[in-house]
Design a protein with these regions (language model features):
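Bacterial N-terminal signal peptides that target proteins for export
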Residues: 2-12
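N-terminal leader/targeting segments
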Residues: 4, 22-29
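Short, well-ordered alpha-helical segments
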Residues: 60-75
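N-terminal signal peptide c-region/cleavage motif recognized by signal peptidases
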Residues: 15, 20-22
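Amphipathic, charged alpha-helical segments and their helix-to-coil junctions
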Residues: 26-62, 78, 82-113
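General structural signal for secondary-structure boundaries
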Residues: 10-15, 27
Length: 113
């Protein structure tokens, strides 16, 4: 059975659309701008919205895992405990957060900067 070019292209487009789904997921900057996520004082991202979808959870977990690996390495180089380094980075990240985006206060509440 021969597939004509049109059917092959349709099949290819369908396959690529299934593979490319993560490309359409929201970015960190978009999620911050929309008020879905924000910076916490511990150096990690947190989810602001009460009902996050799976893509948002995956985004935050992926970024936080990368941050943790970087913090472990940097804390070791600096000769400090990881939690000390995390707190320093958390403060820097919150300080750099633009107006209109969220930061988590020490009392656990989210505040729009």
């Amino acid at each position: 059975m021969k597939l004509n070019l049109s059917k092959m292209l349709t099949l290819l487009a369908l396959t690529l659309s299934l593979i490319a789904v993560p490309v359409w997921a929201i970015s960190k900057d978009e999620a911050k701008a929309k008020g879905l996520i924000g910076e916490q004082s511990n150096g990690y991202l947190g989810i602001v919205t009460a009902s996050p979808n799976a893509d948002l959870k995956t985004l935050v977990n992926t970024i936080n895992n990368k941050r943790k690996a970087a913090y472990v390495k940097s804390a070791s180089k600096a000769g400090v405990e990881r939690n000390v380094f995390e707190a320093r980075m958390g403060q820097r990240l919150q300080d750099k957060t633009p107006a209109g985006q969220y930061i988590k206060l020490p009392n656990g509440k989210w505040k729009k900067k």
